[in-house]
Amino acid sequence: MDNKTDNKNNLTPQSAPSSAPHKERLTPMMEQYIEIKAVNSDCLLFYRMGDFYELFFNDAIEAAQVLGITLTTRGKHLGEDIPMCGVPVHTADDYLQKLISCGYRVAVCEQTEDPAEAKKRGSKSIVRRDVVRLVTPGTLTEEKLLDPTRANYLMTLARIKTSDGEEFALSWIDISTGIFRVTESRLEKLLADIMRVDPQEIIVADSFFHDKSHKSLFNVLDCIVSPQHASLFDVITAERDICSYFKLSTLEGIADYSRPELSAIAAAIRYIEKTQITHRPPLMRPERQNESATLFIDAATRLSLELVRTTSGQRDGSLLKAIDRTVTGGGSRLLLDRLIAPLTTPSAIDKRLDSIAFFLRNTSLAEDIKLILKGGPDMPRAVSRLALGRGGPRDMASIQRGFEIIRELHQLLSNELLPQEISDVQQIFSHLPTALHLRLEQALADDLPLLKRDGGFIRPHYHKELDEMRTLRDESRRVIAELQAQYAQETDIKTLKIKHNNILGYFIEVTNLQATALTNTPQAKARFIHRQTMANAMRFTTTELAELESRIAHAANHALTLELEIFDTLVHEITEQVDFIRKAAESLAVLDVSVALAHLAEEQGYCRPKIDQSLTFCITAGRHPVVEQALRKQAAEPFVANNCDLSLQENHQYAAIWLLTGPNMGGKSTFLRQNALIAIMAQMGSFVPATSAHIGVVDRLFSRVGASDDLARGRSTFMMEMVETATILNHATQHSLVILDEIGRGTSTFDGLSIAWATVEYLHEVNHCRAILATHFHEMTALTEKLDRLHNVTMKVKNWDGDVIFLHEVTPGAADRSYGVQVAKLAGLPKAVITRATDVLQQLEQGEMAGKGHKLIDDLPLFSLKTTSSLNEDTNKYSMLHEAFKNIHPDELSPKQALEALYHLKQLEKNNPL
């Protein structure tokens, strides 16, 4: 993954002019532009000019290239043309989307007064303009700019330096829904925590970003990283700023946030205020995420298991795509949220499973709910847009439609004996603000415009004065038509038209030849007042037409003013109910996910897993959820189900480890992955692809399946493999599940075998975790003779006339060969190569390689299998020596003191031999 550093973070200021242009000989408008640009030099400036946003200088060059629009010029500066491009205001979202996706920040500069007000300040005064918003990847709210199926998180990453080292915290916000969460982290799990949230933009202090010791972290992030001044993370004023935002007198009783958490929360709030400028989005209070409440999945494991996206970045082929049957945007986001953070508390998992079981028993009810939910509105995002002043009549209609869905579902569920999770949903639905629901139904028209400025969104008969203004406006337009007919008859000009434009208002238009009929007598000249001569037409007005125009303009303007006042009143009432709207929307998502997972379980034949706190891991007839569905779509052979039992066995204190051998293409990697995916699905609260499943809660899941280089950090495939294996060995516990595929294959045979051998021993004797390890080192199968919890299993194959048939069945036992030559034959290698490879293989198998595994067992006692306590003793001894060395300052010692220090170290080593 390549991190996309914010193009506009002053590190690579591609959009800002290399040097600010001088103001000399510039128009007042261009002077204003340069002043505003100077304050927002790290952004592309969208400068409002009538119906366009215009960009100038380097901004224009950059934007024109990215957007594929015409680059032109306007005016000159220092003898050179000023580059300029522009985009229409009504399609600006489309262009913003492209710029944001390319890593740009955009400052939106609007006209804050109309030209008439500017003229009152003087004939040469220009319209006031101000930046009203900074658009960044993590602060989007517009429907066009957002993916309805995923959250749009802005993350702040805080670091606090202490005498003991560094402390970290993360906070993440989706301003489009109001979600606000925070958690503490550690350096070794920062990447995993960031990848779990999957933010669109990360805010860090510039000092942290430029710290060379953390460079590798930022190099691998696949999102925009925006370094900011360290003051954004100031922890001294953090509590004050947080209380100010949420209108609290104190944080006591809310949460006992740590200093890093306070820094991260405050930074998020300050950045939101910095980018939103004129509005404060209604955010939820920061919810602390407990590290132990969710299954820890490290970054490498998330990638290798392809939970949300495949390794090539596609959604198709991922676990999420395979299990998603939701019908709403909120449901899709909740399903994703559950998938990336499975639970570790059996009772909480069972609440979710109870909901699925309920809908499996009540399929008709589930179908009714699905029909009601299908295509339902995204209420949290609609209410956020309304609160931020970016919403329109259709967002208001989304709230009204959402209320209607809640009312229908509340009635539908009222006669059912509900499981706890659905009962909680029903309880929230019971608090529907019926008065507001009724008011929205009565107020909103059936056919709504996109923008409130277009008017016509309030239903007739809702507001008496508005109806009167509309009648006057519409009646006046009818009078215009009658007046046109009257003038045509009086002048005997059948083609006479009364037209309108924004410059002249209403006017009479005739051809140049016909104009003489309006000017040939003094009476006609007095009545028909000349306004404009065109190439082929002349334009006139009359006193009565001017008076009528004034009445129409007043009525139309007043009608729109009244509509906007009603809109603002309704927005205020809606935002007063923001807490209910968010809880209700979350409840709708819970219903959607529960019904969707019930549908998935019925469609795919999944079973309810048994989840407890034991060390059990027993899967009967497990299948890979993604591969199984792919085979069905291809009408291929059905997926071969396999059992997996790593459970605690009689007379053993810890769970089992399986050592899996077998041929290439035999299905080893699929078997490894499917068991990891089954564990994730079970703990996210889903039924699983098996006939039965009993899983003791997994606290940490580690998977090293597949291999790739990390060229950005100068790491080879083998180095990456060793780094990931080190993470597993250093952090796996007895409640963890470890999946390892072909450890040691990236180096020489003997090196690889040695590392794999020692790794299995360590997992067995130190980590005590549940594990499945696949290997081609058949010598390792002999380890089962001395490791009592290690069991050999193999992928079953059949030989038929010299060809190998893969049965994809896992059975007890060990493979004696890998069938690599047979696989090469299937791949189409030349016959001569296959023949030669077969000869070489036979010679090797008959030579000194034979029987190596048992010889190793005989020659190598289990010397490395130290107990955890003995390992801790070694660590303590090293710590004592390290502490002694740390307290020695050679430049400050006299010769006598140096000698005494040396004797002291010698005595320490003697008393604590390693």
Swiss-Prot record:
Superkingdom as given in the UniProt entry: Bacteria
Sorted UniProt keywords: ATP-binding, DNA damage, DNA repair, DNA-binding, Nucleotide-binding
Bridged cysteine pairs (disulfide): none
InterPro entries: DNA_mismatch_repair_MutS, DNA_mismatch_repair_MutS-lik_N, DNA_mismatch_repair_MutS/MSH, DNA_mismatch_repair_MutS_C, DNA_mismatch_repair_MutS_clamp, DNA_mismatch_repair_MutS_core, DNA_mismatch_repair_MutS_N, DNA_mismatch_repair_MutS_sf
CDD domains noted in UniProt: ABC_MutS1 (cd03284)
Residue span of region Disordered: 1-24
Entry GO CC: cytosol
Binding-site list for ATP: 662-669
Regions that span the bilayer: none
GO molecular-function term, one example from the UniProt record: damaged DNA binding
Keyword DNA-binding on entry: yes
NCBIfam families: mutS1 (TIGR01070), PRK05399.1 (NF003810)
Family: Belongs to the DNA mismatch repair MutS family.
Name recorded for this polypeptide: DNA mismatch repair protein MutS
Gene: mutS
